[in-house]
């Protein structure tokens, strides 16, 4: 095998490695998006189950409570602020105390995700 053939093979391998590296980067971005969506959906599911459980419990106790207390309880939802923060994070903004409100630039923030873990 001549020097030119070896050089061509190394050049081809370098090109293939570059393409694989690019594909790996694309997969990493897709995986990050999927993990973020999975995390958001898990939290949303948790809150919906919690609201459903409260709704079922309220149905049992509504007849025992005065009308004013029932209206107050249904008017303010306990997870409303959390849902707003989750929506802001989903829209691409930081919700952590370090960079609150600044754009995330399509990256996950461990401090923002830590906030979600603390509120479970």
Swiss-Prot record:
GO terms for biological process: DNA replication. InterPro entries: YabA (IPR010377). GO terms for cellular component: nucleoid. It holds the Pfam family YabA. Residues 45-80 are annotated as: Disordered. Its cofactor is Zn(2+). Transmembrane segments: none annotated. Residues 45-63 have a biased composition (Basic and acidic residues). The keyword Nucleotide-binding does not apply. Keywords: Cytoplasm, DNA replication, DNA replication inhibitor, Metal-binding, Zinc. It is found in: Cytoplasm, Nucleoid. Zn(2+) binds at residues 94, 96, 109, 112. Binds 1 zinc ion per subunit. Homotetramer. Interacts with both DnaA and DnaN, acting as a bridge between these two proteins. Involved in control of chromosome replication initiation. Inhibits the cooperative binding of DnaA to the oriC region, thus negatively regulating initiation of chromosome replication. Inhibits the ability of DnaA-ATP to form a helix on DNA; does not disassemble preformed DnaA-DNA helices. Decreases the residence time of DnaA on the chromosome at its binding sites (oriC, replication forks and promoter-binding sites). Tethers DnaA to the replication machinery via the DNA polymerase beta sliding clamp subunit (dnaN). Belongs to the YabA family. This is Replication initiation control protein YabA. It comes from Oceanobacillus iheyensis (strain DSM 14371 / CIP 107618 / JCM 11309 / KCTC 3954 / HTE831). The gene is yabA.
